[in-house]
């Protein structure tokens, strides 16, 4: 029996909680389904009507991440895993449609099975887990689901969290239900965490300290796209002249757009802008706003280029990182919205591009502080944004300094991946083929 395993009553109460949460969110789900067309492809698998199949023979390693960023960080680890353990079959799941689409794009060419994780109701998830029968579970950053992991553990799987983190808010919620917190994490065999702060939070919830290792943040370890051929390729594809400046506004939310529209209007120089909304269903709203400002724009889906337009809206998923490499400056969205707290601050650095972001970075405050202390990023506020952008565009040597510091940051952090991999190998079970 798994230490700390929940009773049938715990499972029943947990299922009741999920049903209650689902009913509370149902109006929003229906709105997105019928107004924005979301969830059309995922309902069958989410409710267990469609059973995923994993072709081939051999043990199964099941990797899971909540959404786009969490699944993307699995790529280098999974590539290494497939190279050193070719007898294993691999599965990658995500909780969101955007995460699944990105996972399919990244992992599909590698022969990896990808699908959206079904709802964690015991009656739905347990038959799926039994059908796949994984020998290894790998959770990106800690997006564990109780019925999912408990059923896999019952079948003998090993479970490990990589790049693990626990926010202060999540820690508070688990602390209120401390006993529940212990049960939540007790089935996990290993915790490979980002830093000591996250370790302290897991310990506070009663996780066995022998299970925990601080291996570093592996979001910093992906293939760098900053080589000249990448930059030149994307600038040529976008039809950008050599002396034309490009500002990429990545993963922007409405509040980011609200800040940037007057800035772009005021700058009005030899500057092109690539708008990448966090949610592509907001592309129509962005089109209306640009039209209102008399800004000439085209759509990425229509193969628009800057030869005809001053702005391009990227109305497709999965292109942001490649397009960052063409930029002279890259802004990371969600950082002018205090409800969001920012997205992946590292992607511009990995593309060899100067990083700028707004003041709301609470979702990754530790990382932002490290970047700022090293001079690898620039934090803007609404009062100085035009002045700072103008200064950076007028002084290429300042942009070059940001790029250099960013490269140093990534080089120093690369060792985190090596530490994570060496620790992760200890949890890969020896399975008879």
Curated annotation (Swiss-Prot):
Pfam families, A to Z: Glycos_transf_N
Membrane disposition: Single-pass membrane protein
Pathway in which the depicted protein is active: Bacterial outer membrane biogenesis; LPS core biosynthesis
Catalytic activity: lipid IVA (E. coli) + CMP-3-deoxy-beta-D-manno-octulosonate = alpha-Kdo-(2->6)-lipid IVA (E. coli) + CMP + H(+); alpha-Kdo-(2->6)-lipid IVA (E. coli) + CMP-3-deoxy-beta-D-manno-octulosonate = alpha-Kdo-(2->4)-alpha-Kdo-(2->6)-lipid IVA (E. coli) + CMP + H(+); alpha-Kdo-(2->4)-alpha-Kdo-(2->6)-lipid IVA (E. coli) + CMP-3-deoxy-beta-D-manno-octulosonate = alpha-Kdo-(2->8)-alpha-Kdo-(2->4)-alpha-Kdo-(2->6)-lipid IVA (E. coli) + CMP + H(+); alpha-Kdo-(2->8)-alpha-Kdo-(2->4)-alpha-Kdo-(2->6)-lipid IVA (E. coli) + CMP-3-deoxy-beta-D-manno-octulosonate = alpha-Kdo-(2->8)-[alpha-Kdo-(2->4)]-alpha-Kdo-(2->4)-alpha-Kdo-(2->6)-lipid IVA + CMP + H(+)
Active site: 70 (proton acceptor)
GO biological process: lipid A biosynthetic process; lipopolysaccharide core region biosynthetic process
Site (Transition state stabilizer): 141, 219
Keyword Transferase among record annotations: yes
GO molecular function per UniProt: Kdo transferase activity
Highest taxon above the source species: Bacteria
GO-annotated cellular components: plasma membrane
EC number(s) given by UniProt: 2.4.99.12, 2.4.99.13, 2.4.99.14, 2.4.99.15
Chain sites annotated for binding CMP: 277-278, 317-319, 344-347
Function: Involved in lipopolysaccharide (LPS) biosynthesis. Catalyzes the transfer of predominantly four 3-deoxy-D-manno-octulosonate (Kdo) residues from CMP-Kdo to lipid IV(A), the tetraacyldisaccharide-1,4'-bisphosphate precursor of lipid A. Thus generates the genus-specific LPS epitope of Chlamydia, composed of the trisaccharide alpha-Kdo-(2->8)-alpha-Kdo-(2->4)-alpha-Kdo.
Xref: PANTHER family: 3-DEOXY-D-MANNO-OCTULOSONIC ACID TRANSFERASE, MITOCHONDRIAL-RELATED, 3-DEOXY-MANNO-OCTULOSONATE CYTIDYLYLTRANSFERASE
Family: Belongs to the glycosyltransferase group 1 family. Glycosyltransferase 30 subfamily.
UniProt-recorded name of the protein: 3-deoxy-D-manno-octulosonic acid transferase
Source organism of the structure: Chlamydophila psittaci (strain ATCC VR-125 / 6BC)
């Amino acid at each position: 029996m798994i230490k700390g395993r929940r009773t049938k009553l715990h499972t029943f109460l947990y299922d009741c909680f999920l049903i209650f949460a689902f009913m509370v969110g149902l109006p929003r789900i229906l709105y997105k389904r019928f107004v924005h067309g979301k969830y059309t492809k995922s309902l069958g698998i989410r409710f267990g009507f469609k059973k995923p199949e994993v072709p081939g023979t051999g043990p199964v390693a099941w990797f899971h991440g909540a959404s786009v960023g969490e699944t993307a960080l699995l790529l280098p680890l999974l590539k290494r895993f497939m190279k050193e353990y070719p007898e294993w079959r691999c599965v990658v799941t995500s909780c969101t449609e955007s995460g699944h689409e990105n996972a399919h794009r990244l992992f599909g060419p590698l022969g990896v099975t990808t699908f959206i994780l079904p709802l964690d109701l015991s009656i739905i998830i347990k038959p799926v887990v039994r059908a796949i029968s994984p020998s290894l579970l790998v959770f990106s950053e800690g997006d564990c689901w109780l019925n999912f992991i408990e059923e896999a553990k019952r079948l003998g799987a090993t479970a490990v969290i990589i790049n693990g983190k626990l926010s202060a808010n999540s820690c508070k919620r688990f602390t209120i239900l401390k006993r529940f917190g212990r049960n939540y994490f007790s089935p996990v065999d290993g915790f490979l965490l980002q830093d000591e702060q996250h370790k302290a939070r897991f310990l506070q919830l009663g996780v066995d300290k022998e299970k925990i290792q601080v291996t570093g943040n592996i979001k910093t370890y992906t293939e760098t796209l900053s080589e000249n051929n990448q930059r030149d390729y994307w600038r040529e594809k976008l039809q950008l002249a050599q002396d034309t400046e490009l500002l990429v506004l990545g993963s922007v939310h409405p509040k980011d757009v609200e800040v940037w529209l007057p800035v772009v209007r005021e700058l009005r120089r030899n500057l092109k802008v690539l708008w990448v909304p966090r949610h592509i269903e907001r592309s129509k709203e962005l089109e209306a706003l640009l039209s209102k400002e008399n800004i000439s724009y085209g759509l990425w889906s229509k193969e628009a280029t800057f030869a005809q337009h001053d702005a391009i809206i990227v109305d497709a998923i999965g292109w942001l990182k490649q397009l960052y490499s063409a930029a002279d400056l890259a802004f990371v969205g969600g950082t002018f919205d205090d409800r969001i707290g920012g997205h992946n601050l590292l992607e511009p650095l990995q593309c060899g591009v100067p990083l700028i972001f707004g003041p709301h970075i609470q979702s990754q405050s530790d990382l932002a502080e490290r970047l700022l202390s090293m001079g690898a990023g620039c934090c803007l506020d609404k009062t100085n944004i035009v002045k700072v952008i103008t200064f950076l565009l007028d002084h290429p040597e300042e942009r070059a300094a940001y790029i250099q510091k960013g490269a140093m940051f990534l080089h120093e952090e690369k060792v985190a991946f090596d530490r994570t991999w060496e620790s992760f190998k200890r949890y890969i079970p020896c399975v008879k083929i």
